[in-house]
Amino acid sequence: MRLKLIPKNEQELSKLFVLIFPLTLLLASLTSFLKDAYFTFANLIPNNKIFNYGFLDTLHYQATYGVLFATCICLSFTYLFSKSLGRIAILFPILFLTLLGLVGTEFLDLVLSFFYQDRINVVGNSSLLIILKLLVGFGLFSLASLNLLAKREASIFVSAQFIYGAIVFYFISLLISRSELVVFTDSLMIKSLHTSMYIYVCVSFVFLSIVHFLMTKPLGATLFNKTLTAITFWGFLFLLPWTNFKYYFGSVIPNWLENVSIYLSLSLLVPLLAFAVNYVKTIQTKEDEGNKSSSLMSFSVIIFLITNLLHIISSFENILPIVGLTNFQNVINQGYIGSLIFASISFVYYLIPKVFGRLVKYSRLEDLVFSGLKFMYPVLLINNFLIGVNSGYSWNAGANAGSPTIYGEGFSLSLIHI
C-alpha cells in the first residue's frame, strides 16, 4: 500500500481519509466510553479538572461532532463532490490543504480543551482557534463554490448538492457562534440555532449525500425520482435549522419562536416521506446485492428515519413538556450522528477496493462487529430515550406538586452556559 505525502488527485487524497476515519471513530468511541464509565464509577474516581462529567462530556462532543464529523465531510467531499460534477477538482493543492486544515483545527480544538477549560466555547477554545476555523470554513466554501461553477455536467448528481449544502451550513454555524454574548437568552438562542444548523442540517446532509451514492452506484440501481430528492433537499434545508428551539419549551426563549419551531418540526414529515419513498423505490431497482457492509447503509437509513420520527412526534403538545430540556435531546443528536457513522463505515468499505486496488475479505469478525453495532447503538438510543422521558415525568410531577425535582429543567444549560 502506497500513501503519497502530497497527493496529486482526489483518489490519492481519498486514501488518506479512508485511513484517518477509523482512527477518529476509535477516538470518539474512547471518549464516549470514558464519559459513561466516569458517570458510572464517579464515587470511586477522584474529581479534578480532567475527571469530571462536564469536561468529559465536552471532550466527547468535540471528538464526535468535531474531529469525526470533519473527517466524514472530507471523505465524502474528496470522493463524491468532483465525481458528481464530472471533472477533477480545480485548485487541488489548496483544496488538499483546506481539508487537512478542517480536520486539523478540530483536532487542535480537542487538544486545547485540556489546557483552556475555562474558555470552552461552542465552536472553539480561544479566539484565535475560532478565527482559524472560520478561515478554513470560508476556504472550503469558496473552493466548493468554484468547483460548482466550473462543473461540466448539465445536471449534477444529488450527492454534490447535499455536500455543498452541508458546507454552506457548516460555515454559517461558525459565523453565528463567533459573537460573544452576555445576555443568557441570546446565548441560549444562538446555541440552539448552532445545534440545529451544525448537527441537524450538516450531519444530515453529509449522511444523505453518502446514502444517495451508496443506494445507486454500488448496487447498480437507478435513482427513482429527482423531484422527490429536491423535496428532501429543500425541505430539510428550510425546516431543520429551526427545530431545536422547541426543546427549550418553557424557558427564556420567546414563545413565538418555540411555536414556530413546533410547526416546522411537524412539517419535517414531508421531506422525510419523500426520502423514504425515493429510497425504497430506488433499492427495488438494484441489480447487485452488494457486499456485507451494504447492510450498514440500510441500517443507517432506519436510524435516520426513526430519529426524524422522534423529532416530529416530540412536537405534539402533550409530549413536548415531557421531553424538552431532558436527555431526549441526546437521542436526536446521537441518532443523526449515528446514521452518518454507519453510512460512512459502509462507504469506507466500498472505497477500499476502489482506491487501494484490493478486495476486502469479509470474515466472522466483520459479522460480529456489524451485528454488535446494530445491537448496541439502538440500545444506547433507547437508554437515553427512557432517561429523558423518566426525568421529564419526574420534573412535571414535582412541578405540579410545588416541589421541583432534579434533572428535568436545566439539562444542557449548566454545563454549556454557566
Please report, for each region that a protein language model flagged, where it lies by residue.
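An N-terminus-focused feature that recognizes amino-terminal "leader" regions
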Residues: L27, F33, F55-L59, A63
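Structural signature of hydrophobic alpha-helical transmembrane segments
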Residues: Y65, S196-S204, I262-L268
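Catalytic cores of extracellular degradative/oxidative enzymes
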Residues: A166-Y170, I199, I210, L214
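Alpha-helical transmembrane segments of multi-pass integral membrane proteins
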Residues: F21-T31, L100-E106, V136-G139, A160-R178, ...
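Divalent metal-coordination and catalytic microenvironments
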Residues: S196, V280, F375
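Core segments of alpha-helical transmembrane spans in multipass integral membrane proteins
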Residues: H60-L75, Y200, Q334-V348, F375
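Juxtamembrane membrane-water interface segments of multi-pass membrane proteins
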Residues: R2-L16, L34-D57, C72-L95, V111-V122, ...
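Conserved small/polar residues in nucleotide/adenosyl-binding loops
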Residues: I416-I418
